[in-house]
Amino acid sequence: ETFETIFHGSEEERFYHEAGEDKGFMEDTGNHDARTEGMSYGMMVCLQLDKKEEFDRLWKWTRTYMYMDEGPGKNYFAWSCALDGTRNADGPAPDGEEYFAMALFFASRRWGDGEGIFNYSREAKAILHECVHKGEPGHPGDPMWEPSNKLIKFVPGLDFSDPSYHLPHFY
């Protein structure tokens, strides 16, 4: 019942909205935007409840609008987008990437890998590779995990963490 309300309830009740033929997003109702945190949590809920269509819609919206293919955040996800997909941010929030990777690994096990962006395990590995290896020789940018202590950062360019980003049950 809760899933149905959040994903398919009335316009006043739901957080999930379909966009076009094959995309969907989770609205942060307090800020009227879509955030990597909410998108990745939505994917995790869909995964746990075996809702592949909604999962794929969320992932496609994320890859279409949030994925950054240039600049310092290249191969990361913009942490906030307007509901039309316009980016509100040029940088990531590492908890989103962390949840995206885990949801994609779980999706690979539940539904198997598909083609393109729906090759879930390949996408998850690519996210984690960027998160860990940015900043190494030949790989510009800042990693999401601090190499010296292995703690996830609050944002890649800063040297402090956020305790809410630590998800030991993922490892």
Language model features by range: what are they?
Residues 1-9, 14-15, 29-36, 71-74, ...:
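Extended ligand-binding clefts on enzyme/binding-domain cores
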